[in-house]
């Protein structure tokens, strides 16, 4: 086992450039969910070191903000190039550390590349506005300036992509970035920063501390939340985590981008292309072993289609291969750890107590792999209640019938989270109704595509207990900048707005 671990560490060091100083005999023990084996032990950041890192990041910001935005974009372009060069190696590490199937591990790195490409173009489009003014010989405009140190707290399920969504935009906007990754996936974070160092060398150097990482548990993440030199924190995690983070940021008037829980639904209407819907439902419900924030967790099927559609879906659930995510024919890998498997068991027991009929859902033994493997569960509920109302981070799909579209939309909106949603229909009126003000209440509403698989061109995030944050998309850059309104008087008089008169007495 020691030799196996040594070889893995050598791969991370030699192929991705992670320094030996990142590892330690005592610290964060990193286990692969694939086989439960210890990959490495990572040195933790002390509270004092965390404070010093943030101080250094603030100094880096003070320098970086004066670099022209297109030049900042050039660094991000080089970062994207380095990610392309190391896509396969980093993608395999995502699979090893997070348990995703290999195509999803590679796809996550592609997301990083995509957001870098997007941010490069954005670096020449940080537009302000010139605004009509009522005062003669005046000009009024809005300008945008870098904000400061941007903190990023990410979760295990997208161990590198979430950082890139924030970092690529924050960098072109003139900010520094301090990253606190999940304690379950620190190696991918270290590898990402090592790749960024390669880009920095090609760029000609960047300010020390412009990109940095904090290793540890929630107490180290709290340093980002509490530090006055961090004006923005993007936090991805559970709604419970958001309830802890948001008040602390609000208390010091810091900005928050909260990407929290999702209890996403899809509606299958009578006119749906059922072959397309079946594939979309399967991908959204069982991909990443149900551990996406956009995982499909509730399926609302019209009563006329319920039996034939569920018959086909049961066959899919019974045939999908579960096992080592590094194998090309495996579609469902492990849950992140045994605790996740326990939570899945509890949710299924609660559904069964309500009278649900369950297909799948049992624990799966994979030869030679000591991971937390489970069969995806198809749970036919008598009503939307109990565990169907909350998010369980596991491959559980609760299925319900509906009679009218109004009823289906009410079911879809009848939960605390409001991240992603979808409707499968060929009826234009139904589609437009779903997207209208009285349709889906989610931040993402799709037609004939599931709730998962967002692209960086669209704003990502949700409403209600999902937190209200947005990342990527057309105007996400504004979150990483501060806006100033400027009025210039180039005349010789001082006209006041709104016709106010304030004439000083004359001698």
List where the protein language model places each region:
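Rossmann-like NAD(P) dinucleotide-binding subdomain of oxidoreductase/dehydrogenase enzymes
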Residues: 128-276, 402
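Active-site and channel-lining beta-strand-loop segments
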Residues: 20-45, 463
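Short, basic/aromatic recognition patches
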Residues: 9-23
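ALDH superfamily catalytic-core signature
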Residues: 198, 240-383, 405, 410, ...
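Conserved C-terminal structural/oligomerization subdomain of aldehyde/semialdehyde dehydrogenase
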Residues: 35-41, 205, 230, 267, ...
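Single conserved hydrophobic/aromatic residue that forms the stacking wall/gate
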Residues: 1-8
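Residue-level signal for inorganic ion chemistry
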Residues: 36, 72, 94, 116, ...
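Glycine-rich loop-to-alpha-helix module at the N-terminal edge of alpha/beta enzyme cores
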Residues: 39-127, 137
